[in-house]
Structure formats: structure tokens, C-alpha cells
UniProtKB/Swiss-Prot annotation:
Record's catalysed reaction(s): shikimate + ATP = 3-phosphoshikimate + ADP + H(+)
Subcellular location: Cytoplasm
Note: Two isozymes have been found in E.coli. AroK has 100-fold lower affinity for shikimate than AroL, suggesting that AroL is the dominant enzyme in the biosynthesis of the aromatic amino acids, with AroK playing a secondary role and possibly participating in an as yet unidentified cellular process.
The family this protein is said to belong to: Belongs to the shikimate kinase family.
Residues that span the membrane, as ranges: none
Protein name, UniProt field: Shikimate kinase 1
Pathway annotation: Metabolic intermediate biosynthesis; chorismate biosynthesis; chorismate from D-erythrose 4-phosphate and phosphoenolpyruvate: step 5/7
């Protein structure tokens, strides 16, 4: 991979976007960004608080602006928020400005990986988490698939193994 293309990770919460993104960036000697962490840096508050204060629409507007700005950089790995693909603008920008890798996982893995995480505003509601994750999957999985250049299942694999798979796929394309 002579020229450093941007690599954008999409997928549901708990798929491993941030963990795998950091590993991938380290292995490729690229800068790593996480759209949720960027929002937290800029607001000085965690995403759950921003979500509560501004509502989902306000949060998504903020997320769209952050992703637009980050995707204009060159040679980065970006872990996007699970719901960022709801924005057509964001989907178009991700597709046009880099290689989109869809990290796929099962609902069971999502539940296991997110059960103790307090930074998941969509899971802190009255509805049981499984039902929330199933509804989100029905809504978002087609959007991830629509823009994915590469799809990789992350269940039962370490971040390093998945990062190596991504690198191999990028080198063979």
C-alpha cells in the first residue's frame, strides 16, 4: 500500500471500531481518530451527555460536521459512530474520501461487549438492550453494506488479527 489511503471503519456499537482502528493505525503508522472522542474533546463532555442535552438530531448534526472535517485529512484511520451512516451526506463523504471497512458482529457479541459500557446512550432506555440492538441492526446494516468496500466479521478475533485481515484486503485491491 504505497500511498496512504484513508480508512474509515463503520459498523454497529461493540463491533470493535475504536479498538481495531487504533491497532490498524499503529500497524500502518497512520493517525487514528474516533468521531465520538473528537466530539467529546470539542464539547468537553461525554457523548452520552451531549446526546441527552442536544437529542439525537443535535448529536447527529455535530457528528456529521466532525466526520466531514476529519475525512478531509489524508492518511488517517477513522472509527465512526454506529449511527453516523444515517446521514446521507456522511455516507457520501466516507465513500468518496477513503476505503470504507464494515466491521460486522452478532447481536450476542454486541451485548457482551457493551453491557458494562456507560457511554452508550441508545442502550440506556427502558427497552431491553437486545431489542434496541436488533432495531438498530435492521435500520443501519443496509446502510453499512451500501457504502462498504470491505466487510469483515469481528466475532472471536483479536484486534490485531482483524487489522491484519484489513491490511491484507487493502493490499490485494
Amino acid at each position: 500500500m504505497a500511498e496512504k489511503r484513508n480508512i474509515f471503519l463503520v459498523g454497529p456499537m461493540g463491533a470493535g471500531k475504536s479498538t481495531i482502528g487504533r491497532q490498524l493505525a499503529q500497524q500502518l503508522n497512520m493517525e487514528f481518530y474516533d468521531s465520538d472522542q473528537e466530539i467529546e474533546k470539542r464539547t468537553g463532555a461525554d457523548v452520552g451527555w451531549v446526546f441527552d442535552l442536544e437529542g439525537e438530531e443535535g448529536f447527529r448534526d455535530r457528528e456529521e460536521k466532525v466526520i466531514n472535517e476529519l475525512t478531509e485529512k489524508q492518511g488517517i484511520v477513522l472509527a465512526t459512530g454506529g449511527g453516523s451512516v444515517k446521514s446521507r451526506e456522511t455516507r457520501n463523504r466516507l465513500s468518496a474520501r477513503g476505503v470504507v471497512v464494515y466491521l460486522e458482529t452478532t447481536i450476542e457479541k454486541q451485548l457482551a461487549r457493551t453491557q458494562r459500557d456507560k457511554k452508550r446512550p441508545l442502550l440506556h432506555v427502558e427497552t431491553p438492550p437486545r431489542e434496541v440492538l436488533e432495531a438498530l441492526a435492521n435500520e443501519r446494516n443496509p446502510l453499512y453494506e451500501e457504502i462498504a468496500d470491505v466487510t469483515i466479521r469481528t466475532d472471536d478475533q483479536s484486534a490485531k488479527v482483524v487489522a491484519n485481515q484489513i491490511i491484507h484486503m487493502l493490499e490485494s485491491n
